[in-house]
Curated annotation (Swiss-Prot):
Origin superkingdom: Eukaryota
Natural source organism: Arabidopsis thaliana
Known outcome of mutating D114E: Impaired oligomerization
GO cellular component: cytoplasm; cytosol; plant-type vacuole
Catalytic activity: Exonucleolytic cleavage in the 3'- to 5'-direction to yield nucleoside 5'-phosphates
Summary of the tissues where the protein is detected: Ubiquitously expressed throughout development in germinating seeds, cotyledons, leaves and roots of young seedlings and adult plants, stems and inflorescence.
The protein's Enzyme Commission number: 3.1.13.1
Gene behind this protein: RICE1
UniProt family annotation: Belongs to the RICE family.
Disruption phenotype: Little effect on miRNAs levels. Plants lacking both RICE1 and RICE2 have reduced miRNAs levels and lower miRNA retained by AGO1, thus leading to the up-regulation of targeted mRNA transcripts.
Subcellular location: Cytoplasm
GO biological process, one term: positive regulation of miRNA metabolic process
Protein name: Protein RISC-INTERACTING CLEARING 3'-5' EXORIBONUCLEASE 1
Residues in the signal sequence: none
Amino acid sequence: MASFDGQGFMMVDNSWVQTKAIDVESTTDISPYLSKILEDSVWNGNRSIVFDVYWDVKSVSTKSEWRLCSVKFSTKNFCLFLRLPNPFCDNLKDLYRFFASKFVTFVGVQIQEDLALLKENHGIVIRSSLEIGKLAAKARGTPIVEFLGTRELAHKILWYDMSRLDSIQSKWDEASSNDRLEAAAIEGWLIFNVYDQLQQ
């Protein structure tokens, strides 16, 4: 069984999010961690996994090349951060299969361009995805909500104390890897809770 043995972080409602950050190499088996994320999404009832992707951008002559360099998956209790190799290895087939799952919905903020880049640049197809901003705008009857980022959207819907996230982000360049992991966990947890709130 996969162990999320990274740092754990307390959220503003006193719940706990356990993390795991992995530098994926050709011999790394990520499938147990993906299974744990999937299992937690099912046990928490809404079958959603919050995801975020991070890109390396390289300019070649007059155009930019985008390469997926890391991905984050969050559920109610876990945050998994995968730093991906360049070039991709065969063991990332598990990641492709995970994204193609029809049993869960991958939820994200401002993900339309990411979905297109994943497909165009890496052949990754997400079968079931949800742009949380669009759902929030429709549910609240406030079109502008669709264009908010993670922090602003979560604040608008949940009204949670954002001081810890703000503190980390205000000093991002000096932030430790542990602080950055905490920010990733907080953001994933916030969007999970926004989705949960909008479904009620």
